[in-house]
């Protein structure tokens, strides 16, 4: 039987070189066919031209690559840098625009630089409600827009207070830092190294040194009289000395501080300031106390009244710092201590007249000092100065000035003082009716 009759192969040729279908037919029991995408032998080299082409050193290193299409190897990163490269004409045009801008605004730029060197003189910033950052749960925003007086900006190296520390110019940038020790209480401390010997006598320490140190009960520094606690007897004397404060008359020692919200504490603080302003405007209620340091108290005076009201200013401080109610209670008592006293008939009387141009700086100093008396963690010097819209140097000056003004009173916070702020407000209300 001839096998060529059973297996037949049909081929068709195409002039365009397309794939020629090859059909294999098996005609025994049925007719079945399938197609394979193959090319004839004379076109097979085009299936894998890169592999079948001969090597030619005169051509490209890549076999099968047409002449004129050779690619040169480029170092890594040259393609991206060439795409981002600025044209020379565009660069010259940008430089020309920058020179024109500097020529038109060179005077403003010089004034701005001089203002920075003078500690911020003449610089203004908008007090916006939008915050640009939120770190440690505290909003960070721009400063306020009221102008600082010229007195604290003329001298860039010193301060009106003799206890000003130059190290306060170098504050850290953190918004929440551990509580720092005040420079008011910075005193040189003796330091010595203990050797390997365990016997104390080998250190040659004279007991008289300790006896002299233990005999020191108080000292004066920068106009402040600072007493050092030693034992329980002195603690009892402190509680007795609180009764010497005329504002605490009639308040029991074991008084309980009533629960109060932040809004109520802020409202009491605002109302206390408003009543003090009202009393200061009354000719019958004139300040008579001359023991307050006039030089330090003058730091609270501003040349012009701020455009922001004291109520909005307090709201801004609370929004950015989120203080507890006790902070405003202590701040209220500090304001009362500075401006109020009692006469021989146990009636409230003004020691100083409060003016509108002193309110904002008085608020700054009272709130800042209150936080340091109560809290272990306070906002950084830089952050609080930006919240209040003043320089760091002025913030230090206001804080120290308030300390010196109330140096004759005990600063230790007690329940009596927390409760006194509310009771004194009630007396002021009845007194101003």
UniProtKB/Swiss-Prot annotation:
UniProt region (Disordered), positions on chain: 1-20, 51-81
CDD domains in UniProt: CYCLIN_ScPCL7-like (cd20558)
Keywords assigned: Carbohydrate metabolism, Cyclin, Cytoplasm, Glycogen metabolism
Coiled coil: none
One BP term from GO: glycogen metabolic process
Annotated family: Belongs to the cyclin family. PHO80 subfamily.
More about this protein: Present with 217 molecules/cell in log phase SD medium.
Subunit structure: Forms a cyclin-CDK complex with PHO85. Interacts with GSY2, independent of the presence of PHO85.
Name of the molecule in the record: PHO85 cyclin-10
Organism of derivation: Saccharomyces cerevisiae (strain ATCC 204508 / S288c) (Baker's yeast)
């Amino acid at each position: 039987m001839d096998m060529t009759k059973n297996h037949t192969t049909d081929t068709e040729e195409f002039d365009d070189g397309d794939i020629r279908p090859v059909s294999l037919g098996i005609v025994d029991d049925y007719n079945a066919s399938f197609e394979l995408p193959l090319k004839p032998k004379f076109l097979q080299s085009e299936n894998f031209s890169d592999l079948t082409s001969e090597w030619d050193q005169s051509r490209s290193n890549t076999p099968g690559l047409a002449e004129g299409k050779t690619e040169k190897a480029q170092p890594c990163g040259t393609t991206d840098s060439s795409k981002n490269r600025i044209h020379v004409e565009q660069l010259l045009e940008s430089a020309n625009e920058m020179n024109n801008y500097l020529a038109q605004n060179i005077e403003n730029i010089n004034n701005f630089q001089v203002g920075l060197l003078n500690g911020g003189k003449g610089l203004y910033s908008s007090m916006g409600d939008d915050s640009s950052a939120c770190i440690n749960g505290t909003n960070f925003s721009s400063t306020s827009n009221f102008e600082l007086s010229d007195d604290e900006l003329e001298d860039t190296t010193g301060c009106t207070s003799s206890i000003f520390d130059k190290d306060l110019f170098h504050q850290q940038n953190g918004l929440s830092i551990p509580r720092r020790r005040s420079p008011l209480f910075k005193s040189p401390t003796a330091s010595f190294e203990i050797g390997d010997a365990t016997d104390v006598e080998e250190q040659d320490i004279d007991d008289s040194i300790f006896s002299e140190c233990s005999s020191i009960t108080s000292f004066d520094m920068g106009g402040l009289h600072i007493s050092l606690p030693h034992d329980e007897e002195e603690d009892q004397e402190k509680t007795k000395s609180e009764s010497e404060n005329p504002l605490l008359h009639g308040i029991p020692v074991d008084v309980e501080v009533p629960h109060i919200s932040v809004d109520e504490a802020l409202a009491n603080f605002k109302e206390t300031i408003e009543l003090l302003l009202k009393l200061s405007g009354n000719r019958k209620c004139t300040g008579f106390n001359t023991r307050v340091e006039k030089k330090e108290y003058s730091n609270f005076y501003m040349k012009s009244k701020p455009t922001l009201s004291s109520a909005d200013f307090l709201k801004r401080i609370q929004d950015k710092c989120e203080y507890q109610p006790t902070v405003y209670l202590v701040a209220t008592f500090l304001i009362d201590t500075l401006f109020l006293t009692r006469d021989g008939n146990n009636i409230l009387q003004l020691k100083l007249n409060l003016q509108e141009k002193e309110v904002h700086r008085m608020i700054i100093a009272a709130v800042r000092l209150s936080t340091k008396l109560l809290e272990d963690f306070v906002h950084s010097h830089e952050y609080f100065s930006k919240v209040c819209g003043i320089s760091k140097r002025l913030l230090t000056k206001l804080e120290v000035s308030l300390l010196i003004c109330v140096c004759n009173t005990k600063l230790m916070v007690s329940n009596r003082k927390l409760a006194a702020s509310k009771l004194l407000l009630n007396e002021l209300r009845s007194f101003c009716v």
